[in-house]
From Swiss-Prot:
Molecular function as annotated in GO: structural constituent of ribosome
Organism superkingdom: Bacteria
Keywords: Ribonucleoprotein, Ribosomal protein
SUPFAM superfamilies per UniProt: Zn-binding ribosomal proteins
An individual GO BP term: translation
InterPro entries the UniProt entry points to: Ribosomal_bL33, Ribosomal_bL33_CS, Ribosomal_bL33_sf, Ribosomal_zn-bd
Record's keyword annotation contains Protein biosynthesis: no
Family in the record: Belongs to the bacterial ribosomal protein bL33 family.
Stored PANTHER family: 54S RIBOSOMAL PROTEIN L39, MITOCHONDRIAL, LARGE RIBOSOMAL SUBUNIT PROTEIN BL33M
Cellular compartments per GO CC: cytosolic large ribosomal subunit
Lineage, top ranks: Bacteria, Bacillati, Actinomycetota, Actinomycetes, Micrococcales
Annotated protein name in UniProt: Large ribosomal subunit protein bL33
Coiled-coil regions, chain positions: none
Chain's gene name: rpmG
PROSITE patterns reported for this sequence: RIBOSOMAL_L33
């Protein structure tokens, strides 16, 4: 079954704001979160929790 072009749950990259270049890959619901996501997650390079922002 083919996916729709404008998927309701697209795959997005979350990049660390600490400047380490570490990324997480996740899905988001466009209807609930139309803006860019900002989450606090663990960055193993600096061994701390930092903000991760959605990349486009």
């Amino acid at each position: 079954m083919a996916r729709k072009r404008q998927d309701v749950r697209p795959i997005v990259k979350l990049k660390s704001t600490a400047g380490t270049g570490f990324t997480y890959v996740t899905r988001k619901n466009r209807r609930n979160d139309p803006d860019r996501i900002v989450l606090k997650k663990y960055d193993p390079i600096i061994r701390r929790h930092t903000e991760f922002r959605e990349e486009r």
